[in-house]
From Swiss-Prot:
Upper taxonomic lineage: Eukaryota, Fungi, Dikarya, Ascomycota, Taphrinomycotina
Listed transmembrane segments: 91-111, 137-157
Keywords: Endoplasmic reticulum, Membrane, Transmembrane, Transmembrane helix
Source species: Schizosaccharomyces pombe (strain 972 / ATCC 24843)
Protein name per UniProt: ER membrane protein complex subunit 4
Main localization (coarse): endoplasmic reticulum
Family designation: Belongs to the EMC4 family.
Subcellular location: Endoplasmic reticulum membrane
Cystine bridges: none
Membrane topology: Multi-pass membrane protein
Gene Ontology terms describing biological process: protein insertion into ER membrane
GO terms under cellular component: EMC complex; endoplasmic reticulum
Amino acid sequence: MHINEETDWIDLVKPALAKKPKKIVDNSDKFPTPRGFQQKSLVSKNIHSGNSASSTSIFAKREEELQKDLLLKKAWELAYSPLKQIPMNAILAYMSGNSLQIFSIMTTLMLLVNPLKAITSTGSAFTPFKGTHPGTLWPAMGAYILFQLLLMGIGVYKLQRMGLLPTTTSDWLAWEVSKVFMDRSYGPSKTVL
């Protein structure tokens, strides 16, 4: 049979589809559990004793713990996401130059505004992970804010390198107090001949 020939191929596949799956046999009692693995022995004892309700609750608790751990892991992945952006943004800030051009100014504004938006929406960014253990999201949220502040630091450094931050005394001349002289001399000097 060639693949391009028009045949009723479903008749060829029907016997394979009609087979029922084999019965699943649990052979886990034949093998010893790994060292330090206690959950299996508790579950197998409950199943053999006929206490299926307690084994179901053990499975449900374990499943809930695994779900919370997975949510916490995903929360930390979200917290580390700004850290992965730091090298790219640092290279972009370096490559845009220090002269006052539209591209370098827009890059610098992006480095200041985007982390500020992310910091203000930290609570909404972490709402999918609220089902984790109580109090375990605070370190992840703190790390997220810290990494966003590092991104803002790159933007502030770029502003300073471009000369847009008032860091010298000549930038503050309007608030400088003029020097008060104790003595003044007026008039032309007299020369004696």
